[in-house]
Amino acid sequence: MRRVLSVAFVASVMFASALIAAELKSGLQPGDAPPPYNVKDITGPSEGKSLCYRCKYGARPVVNIFARELTPEVVSLVKKIDGVVGENGEKKMAAFVTLLTNDPDKDEAKLKEIAKKEGLKNVPLTVFDGIAGPEDYKISEKADVTVMMWVGSKVKVNHAFAKGELKAANTKAIVADTKEILN
């Protein structure tokens, strides 16, 4: 009897965790217009400068990955998006990563190391000073990773993941969703 109850308890906890992850809402939602915000470019063409990539990319198809930590899973996602951007140059696709941090100077070397190690060519790694992120973007404090895709100044896709919830299957779905901003 104890074994049955233990199995039932574990199953209910797993179901509840999956439900919470599925319902995590973070960032701008489809239909919203992404407002400008400034980041410090660490690995992109404006390395060392503060700029607004949202403004620079204008109405182009854009993937913006907000992360509070660059875990191996996040790095894998960035590398895959880097490839998609490279394959869609004729459509002027763009992407950038915004690391949300309270210590931007401390994270610069790590970002440069990741970009070099992974051979990132199309996705600038940037830092935003403040773990909460740009206020107008409504990044949930429960979200470790928030991915937004927009084109023509309208968000088309949003994915959000709590700490440890971004998996390979999610990365595959995010990459597949880039078609929503490329058509």
Region spans (language model):
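Conserved helix-turn-beta segment immediately C-terminal to the redox Cys motif
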Residues: 76-96
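N-terminal "domain-start" segment that seeds a small globular fold
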Residues: 22-51, 72
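Short active-site neighborhood of thiol/selenol oxidoreductases, capturing the structured segment around
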Residues: 50-75, 93-98
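Bacterial N-terminal signal peptides that target proteins for export
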Residues: 1-12
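Short, internal strand/loop/helix patches
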Residues: 38, 114-139
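Thiol-based oxidoreductase modules, predominantly thioredoxin-like and allied folds used
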Residues: 91-106, 120-132
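Sec/Tat signal peptide C-region and signal peptidase I cleavage site
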Residues: 12-21
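Thiol/disulfide oxidoreductase modules built on the thioredoxin-like
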Residues: 57, 129-171
